[in-house]
């Protein structure tokens, strides 16, 4: 690996910035040792002493800096805070790239190598992040295995965290670190960087070991008073810079953030419901839907399958489109879209029942965003377990619902079940999209069975550059029977069409289990 690193065509200088303040000397020694052990050798380490007061550290620092000519010791005259220390290091950094190493954490020996190796393949990238775990007295545990770039997930939490590689000039262009966000200064910086670039890459390897200590947020974010508040302010400032009317709340149970956007215009939504119910059953279904929907501008279109005399053409609050011999559900949905003119479309299974009246408004907050193609909800079974919370591709066949069977209010691994985030696909049991997007990608593929057509629709949106959003805030009960039989013919079509993304879903780390989509480490 060291020999390969020396043969890289591009061998940029990496400036590692490590602010130091009253660090236990053994821990700082471990951090420095991990840098000295790097197989990629073109680096510099800047130790920025932020006015330390402990005698043993002050005595040790010069000797530690003298261990290697690539280590530089910088002293601040007084304790100024982590942002000031990092900015000082940034001013003095000579590298084209900067990385950040906390004074008590540890790098894997190939941490720099893996990042520079990625640059050989993708020289245009601006930001690189990798996976991490916790460092304890017993060793390494609690790996955090991250998805590829997920902008909605990033507004729910700073999942990038460690290890971060950034172009030095880009960090300077966005203004460096802002002291008013100390405690979450890295989150604020990364939010500003994300406003300038989407050239963001992920290395799915644990390259950083975050020390868990009594006063570290690696153990509990509450160990650093003000960190949540600083993160909240950073997200608010980010949304304001983007011109988005929104407010941010904190889930104090999970310490995740929730962005609620202002609905700029409640555009008309056609709620498209396939049904084979008789008149009375359908009437009850519609009455329940209307009573639990506060969104002000929608109509209901029922796709009636079966005999003509089951339902009148109009039954009060909805319109009926009839199909005696429809090829499949995809064909009926495509036809229904052609018969409506609303700018937004909601595909809703008759077995779905809203729990809270603002469910459709919550989904509309996301579909109004130009970068979003489709929005899915949290679907809950009659047993109060998760029926659907976004699809993970390539798990147990073509796809499996994330956290399927988990208690409905369970946080999920690393709190992900209760966070707004991106997936490659969401369920057509409750899916909101825009007409222009639906038409751009050609609608549902009528050659595919219902469940796979939903996934295929989302993947076509992803290929066209749109995001798929899952929001756990929109909650519905789902009485839709699970499809027990696999359609091998349709699965073969999907595997041929989407082989790359089925092999590796970008929103599901390759080191996670492929047996179940529960986000636990694979064996």
What does each model-found stretch correspond to?
Residues 95-106, 342-355:
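Short beta-strand-to-loop acidic/aromatic patch adjacent to the donor-nucleotide binding site
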Residues 83, 91, 141-165, 338, ...:
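A recurrent flexible, glycine/aromatic-enriched loop bordering the glycosyltransferase active site
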Residues 110-141, 353-397:
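Conserved donor NDP-sugar-binding/catalytic core segment of glycosyltransferases
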């Amino acid at each position: 690996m060291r020999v390969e690193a020396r043969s890289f065509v591009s061998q940029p200088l990496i400036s590692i910035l490590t602010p130091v303040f009253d660090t236990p000397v053994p821990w700082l020694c471990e951090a420095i040792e991990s840098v000295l052990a790097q197989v990629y050798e073109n680096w510099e380490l800047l130790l920025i002493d932020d006015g330390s007061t402990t005698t043993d550290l002050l005595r040790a620092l010069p000797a530690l800096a003298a261990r290697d000519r690539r280590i530089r010791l910088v002293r601040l005259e007084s304790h100024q805070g982590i942002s000031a220390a990092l900015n000082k290091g940034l001013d003095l950094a000579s590298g084209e790239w900067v990385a950040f190493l906390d004074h008590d954490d540890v790098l894997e020996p190939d941490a720099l190598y893996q990042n520079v190796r990625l640059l050989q393949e993708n020289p245009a990238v601006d930001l690189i992040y990798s996976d991490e775990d916790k460092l304890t007295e017993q060793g390494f545990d609690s790996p955090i295995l991250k998805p590829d770039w997920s902008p909605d997930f990033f507004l729910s939490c700073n999942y990038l965290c460690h290890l971060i590689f950034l172009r030095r000039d880009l960090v300077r262009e966005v203004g460096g670190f802002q002291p008013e966000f100390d405690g979450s200064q890295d989150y604020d910086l990364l939010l500003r960087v994300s406003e300038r670039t989407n050239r963001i890459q992920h290395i799915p390897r644990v390259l950083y070991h975050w020390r868990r200590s009594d006063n570290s947020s690696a153990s509990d974010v509450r160990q650093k008073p003000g960190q949540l508040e600083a993160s909240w302010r950073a997200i608010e400032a980010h949304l304001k810079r983007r011109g988005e009317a929104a407010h941010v709340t904190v889930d104090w149970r999970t310490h995740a953030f929730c962005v609620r956007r202002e609905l700029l215009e409640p555009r008309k939504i056609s709620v498209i419901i396939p049904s084979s119910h008789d008149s009375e059953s359908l009437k009850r279904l519609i009455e329940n839907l209307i009573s639990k929907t506060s969104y002000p501008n929608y109509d209901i279109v029922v796709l009636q399958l079966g005999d003509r005399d089951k339902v009148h053409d109009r039954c009060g609050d909805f319109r009926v489109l009839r199909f005696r011999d429809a090829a499949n559900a995809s064909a009926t949905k495509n036809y229904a879209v052609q018969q409506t003119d609303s700018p937004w479309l909601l595909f809703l299974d008759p077995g779905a029942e809203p729990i809270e009246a603002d469910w459709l408004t919550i989904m509309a907050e996301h579909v109004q965003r130009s970068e979003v193609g489709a929005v899915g909800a949290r679907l809950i079974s009659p047993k109060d377990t998760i029926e659907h919370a976004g699809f993970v591709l390539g798990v147990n066949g073509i796809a499996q619902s994330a956290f399927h069977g988990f208690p409905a209010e369970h946080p999920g691994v690393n709190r992900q079940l209760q966070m707004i985030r991106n997936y490659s696909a969401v369920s057509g049991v409750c899916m909101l999209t825009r007409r222009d997007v639906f038409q751009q990608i050609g609608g549902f593929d009528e050659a595919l069975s219902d469940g796979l057509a939903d996934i295929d629709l989302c993947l076509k949106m992803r290929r066209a550059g749109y995001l798929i959003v899952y929001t756990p805030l929109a909650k519905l009960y789902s009485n839709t029977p699970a499809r027990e039989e696999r359609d091998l013919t349709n699965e073969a079509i999907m595997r041929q069409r989407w082989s790359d993304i089925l092999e590796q879903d970008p929103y599901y780390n390759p080191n996670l289990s492929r047996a179940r989509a529960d986000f636990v480490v694979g064996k």
